Amino acid sequence: MDLTDTQQAILALIAERIDADGVPPSQTEIARAFGFKGVRAAQYHLEALEQAGAIRRVPGQARGIRLAGQGGQTRAAAVSEPVRDDVLRLPVLGRVAAGLPIGADIGSDDFVVLDRVFFSPSPDYLLKVQGDSMRDEGIFNGDLIGVHRTRDARSGQIVVARIDEEITVKLLKIGKDRIRLLPRNPDYAPIEVLPDQDFAIEGLYCGLLRPNR
């Protein structure tokens, strides 16, 4: 798989940061360095680099980018406390709208360590909910939802979806000729995905944490 000029430049940046600082850049730092409008563009290029075998990414680990063939951990990872097999170390990547879609705010390097039994299937990251459109599913403003990264979802599942540069959590409904994202609060209207919109499933909802308020 041939890399684009941008992907080659991102790969060079990753190598430079690991060599200089002992840790790779975050997705936010990559997006900022290349002038991307959102972190989703950085994620797209990282996915392409991983598919090409140039890097690998460690699930559930902040700054989890590794160069292909990198035998050891980064210096930061080497001194961090190990995580047991029965717990998850999940990055909190930003916020997601349970209301009208909001601009994607992805890229925090904060993380939470918790027991695996909280979620099914196992999540890859957490997102903070903003809004109350999913309240009838028990998802409230300020909750941290677990997201299992996948591009595949069935009608009737709760998904984290991207519409253009905006992220939202809704109930997915797939019809013969249209896709709708349904709220679980009668105060909100369904979102119909238009043919000219850039739409993608980012992951499946798989449980939540409710911080003390």
From Swiss-Prot:
Active site: S133 (for autocatalytic cleavage activity), K170 (for autocatalytic cleavage activity)
Matches recorded under InterPro entries: LexA, LexA-like, LexA/Signal_pep-like_sf, LexA_DNA-bd_dom, LexA_repressor, Peptidase_S24_LexA, Peptidase_S24_S26A/B/C, WH-like_DNA-bd_sf
Record site: Cleavage: A98, G99
Keyword terms, alphabetized: Autocatalytic cleavage, DNA damage, DNA repair, DNA replication, DNA-binding, Hydrolase, Repressor, SOS response, Transcription, Transcription regulation
EC numbers: 3.4.21.88
Pfam family, one: Peptidase_S24
Catalytic reaction(s) noted: Hydrolysis of Ala-|-Gly bond in repressor LexA
Signal peptide: none
The protein's enzyme class: hydrolase
GO MF annotation list: DNA binding; serine-type endopeptidase activity
Family: Belongs to the peptidase S24 family.
NCBIfam families (UniProt xref): lexA
HAMAP family in the cross-refs: LexA
Subunit structure: Homodimer.
Annotated protein name in UniProt: LexA repressor 2
Protein source organism: Xanthomonas oryzae pv. oryzae (strain KACC10331 / KXO85)
Name of encoding gene: lexA2
